[in-house]
Amino acid sequence: MNWMSFAPELITLTSALWFLLLSMTARSDPKREHVAALVLSALGLAACLASVGAEGYCFAGAYKVDLFSQVFKVLLAAGLFLIVTLCGELSDIEERNRREFYVLLFVCTLAMMLLVGANHFLVVFISLELSSYSLYVLVALRRDRGLGLEAGIKYFLVGIFASGVMIFGLALLYGASGIAALDGMARVLPGIIHQPAVVIGLLLTLSGFFFKLAVFPFHFWAPDAYQGAANQVSAYIATASKVAAIGVLVRVIASAGDGGTYLVHVLAVLSVVSMTVGNLAAIAQQDLKRLLAYSTVAHAGYVLIGVLSMNPAGYSAAVFYAFALLVMKFTAFLVLVEVASDGGNLRVEELAGLHRRSPILALALMVSLFSLAGIPPTVGFTGKFLVFVAAMGEGHFTLVLIAMINVVISLYYYLLVIKAAYLLEPRQELPALRVSPPLKLLSGVLVIAMVAAGFFPNQIIRVAESAAKALL
């Protein structure tokens, strides 16, 4: 194997080790550390782009490099770089903890890169646990110790339960097939998928990924974790973490071949409940991060629609949706971070007058929310369209109808946020927001990207289709 194809992981590991060594020194320079994190994350992204197209195995076949994993590693590296751009003012992370913050951020990204390329049950489990434990600590790092610790503990408790269920499922699959490698499982599983023990084992295994994706009933941690974590950490959980969850979920589901009837039915039920619970719960939220958390639960349901189609069109739709989620969610959180410049939580009503305080942020928020709602011509609309078409191709018309009803429901609470930003007046005169030129430029680029990917999605769709074919 060409070790250049493993360069993204090596660079990310080296970056984490560098910040770890830096944390052992007495002196701290937040600005230099932020610049270093930007440079290192950009270097990792460049390595991911340079290694696209490489193929091979390493670690005795336990880790696989193919186009599918490379595409997701590019998304993860891009997500890390985007999050680091928001970390110039980490007002809600104590200065003495900021180097540890970067250590955990790079370690978590490394774990998620390993997760999307894992080809062995052991690597899947270890990577998932490493990324999860990094996130538990990141959530608890918030300056408001009570709120952050409470959220971190809730996140941890749900996580260890999901991990226990998952490892039992892995044991069932290994016992039924005698194989622990995913590519070997892909050859054996289609022939035994109709056995009840195999279906149960696969569902229990998937529950670990459902936890990461915030699928019902593994979503209870999400609202509290989003609300209790620092805003940059919440943004990271909502973007990079979800990209990794979609990647490993699609890889494992693809190993099941055409799948079993029971598996499809269970995934359909989880999809419907996730969409419905997420959207209905979001309507009642006044805290913007809790609203976005329940929105994430609903989007997990949309992703499952593509996955349960169990065909190349469904898998490629899920890959496209991962890209769309990364851009849409990050843009919404960028606005949140800039408006709540003191690092505190942001209520929807506090967006009043945003169109005057910062027109570019108001525009970015509006486009991101319209995209999350699936309004054309945005990347969110294209993502939902691809997912729905894949499902209808397999005859899941009722499921698509329920999803479309949920899209209408979601539009209501997204419009409430847009109404606050454009139509409500603040109770007192507020000064204009001071947004740095680089972040203004980034906001404009993201707006253009969301609209351009809606108008001209063909290139991204082709990449997603090629990535999906690498699984088959």
Swiss-Prot record:
Membrane spanning segments where? Answer: 3-23, 34-54, 67-87, 106-126, 156-176, 198-218, 233-253, 263-283, 291-311, 317-337, 360-380, 398-418, 441-461
Q: Where in the cell is it found?
A: Cell inner membrane
Cite the InterPro entries for this sequence.
Answer: NADH-Q_OxRdtase_suN/2 (IPR010096), ND/Mrp_TM (IPR001750)
GO BP term, pick one = ATP synthesis coupled electron transport
Keyword annotations for this protein?
Cell inner membrane, Cell membrane, Membrane, NAD, Quinone, Translocase, Transmembrane, Transmembrane helix, Transport, Ubiquinone
Entry membrane topology: Multi-pass membrane protein
Q: What is its EC number?
A: 7.1.1.-
What Gene Ontology terms describe what this protein does at the molecular function level? NADH dehydrogenase (ubiquinone) activity; NADH:ubiquinone reductase (non-electrogenic) activity; quinone binding
NCBIfam families tied to this protein: NDH_I_N (TIGR01770)
Q: What does this protein do?
A: NDH-1 shuttles electrons from NADH, via FMN and iron-sulfur (Fe-S) centers, to quinones in the respiratory chain. The immediate electron acceptor for the enzyme in this species is believed to be ubiquinone. Couples the redox reaction to proton translocation (for every two electrons transferred, four hydrogen ions are translocated across the cytoplasmic membrane), and thus conserves the redox energy in a proton gradient.
**Can you say what this protein is called?**
NADH-quinone oxidoreductase subunit N 2
